[in-house]
Amino acid sequence: MPAHMLQEISSSYTTTTTITEPPSGNLQNGREKMKKVPLYLEEDIRPEMREDIHDPSYQDEEGPPPKLEYVWRNIILMALLHVGALYGITLIPSSKVYTLLWGIFYYLISALGITAGAHRLWSHRTYKARLPLRIFLIIANTMAFQNDVYEWARDHRAHHKFSETHADPHNSRRGFFFSHVGWLLVRKHPAVKEKGGKLDMSDLKAEKLVMFQRRYYKPGLLLMCFILPTLVPWYCWGETFLHSLFVSTFLRYTLVLNATWLVNSAAHLYGYRPYDKNIQSRENILVSLGAVGEGFHNYHHAFPYDYSASEYRWHINFTTFFIDCMAALGLAYDRKKVSKAAVLARIKRTGDGSHKSS
């Protein structure tokens, strides 16, 4: 792939910023520079944002990893939550239809708070959102209860920059269970604290809405993740409190959590690597179904600045559909999308041969 790429930006707020190849006159110059420019610096179209670009210069120190320090509070609470979710499954046949629809609705909205909000907007800056959309996404993110946006984005940027090392919060080289949920049940590796603490998070520190959520996160999550989804079915259509709590709240919350976690575990262990065979992330359609579009993970790690997190936009990608709808309403803009030429060049250079164009 050429070392330099140009942006085509229209004055319209609904435009998509596209990475394109340089004019033909620059091809030879581009090839010469390719020899000098590291792969991880070639392709970013956000000069103001580099904290999520993989840094291959960082390597784990030799020697045995530190002993795991279990966080028993998290272990007990997570176990109880999953037991509650299993009981919720048994209550599904006797639940009211409105309760099930409410659970699905709450699942989708809270999932968007992670995918369109914490992930594609605030972690990667792949598009921009006007205030009404940012307010919606911060509320949806609070509904999901997966840490506040600031902490989620810091961990995720570290995951990309130091992927598959001890500085990666959910390093998949430590196994499926660790990358899925185990990383939340133990103290963070010292490298995660060290490297994560050095990341530039000034963009989020400067965003008042993100800092407001962080300041009031505990009461916010109690209201939006637990109290509201339980009270609405109970009060509005006479569902039993038991069904409201265990189906609408515990089961729904557990499903959203595991859908997100599968991106960290299954999508780093199972699937093809059509864009870059040198990284662990994979294309996993089943993960995309549950995580509303986040399973095209080899593409996402190859091009973390693409707002679609996929080559194919709406294909099994409800999050991209949502962002495009918001763009049509004028609430999302400056959506960054990698050009077809750039994608094909990357496939040819580093793909595993599984792409249909190969």
Swiss-Prot record:
Q: Where is this motif: Histidine box-3?
A: 297-301
Give the source's domain of life in one word: Eukaryota
Q: Which GO terms describe its molecular function?
A: iron ion binding; metal ion binding; oxidoreductase activity; palmitoyl-CoA 9-desaturase activity; stearoyl-CoA 9-desaturase activity
Which chemical reaction does it catalyze? octadecanoyl-CoA + 2 Fe(II)-[cytochrome b5] + O2 + 2 H(+) = (9Z)-octadecenoyl-CoA + 2 Fe(III)-[cytochrome b5] + 2 H2O
Q: Which PROSITE patterns match?
A: FATTY_ACID_DESATUR_1
Q: Where are the transmembrane segments?
A: 72-92, 97-117, 217-236, 241-262
What keywords were assigned to this record? Endoplasmic reticulum, Fatty acid biosynthesis, Fatty acid metabolism, Iron, Lipid biosynthesis, Lipid metabolism, Membrane, Metal-binding, Oxidoreductase, Transmembrane, Transmembrane helix
Which intervals of the chain are annotated as region Disordered?
8-33
Upon changing residue 159 to A, the result is: Abolishes enzyme activity
Organ and tissue specificity: Detected in liver (at protein level). Detected in adipose tissue. Detected in liver when rats are kept on a fat-free diet, but not when their food contains unsaturated fatty acids.
Q: What class of enzyme is it?
A: oxidoreductase
Which cofactors? Answer: Fe(2+)
Describe the task this protein carries out. Answer: Stearoyl-CoA desaturase that utilizes O(2) and electrons from reduced cytochrome b5 to introduce the first double bond into saturated fatty acyl-CoA substrates. Catalyzes the insertion of a cis double bond at the Delta-9 position into fatty acyl-CoA substrates including palmitoyl-CoA and stearoyl-CoA. Gives rise to a mixture of 16:1 and 18:1 unsaturated fatty acids. Plays an important role in lipid biosynthesis. Plays an important role in regulating the expression of genes that are involved in lipogenesis and in regulating mitochondrial fatty acid oxidation.
Q: What is this protein called?
A: Acyl-CoA desaturase 1
Q: Which gene encodes it?
A: Scd1
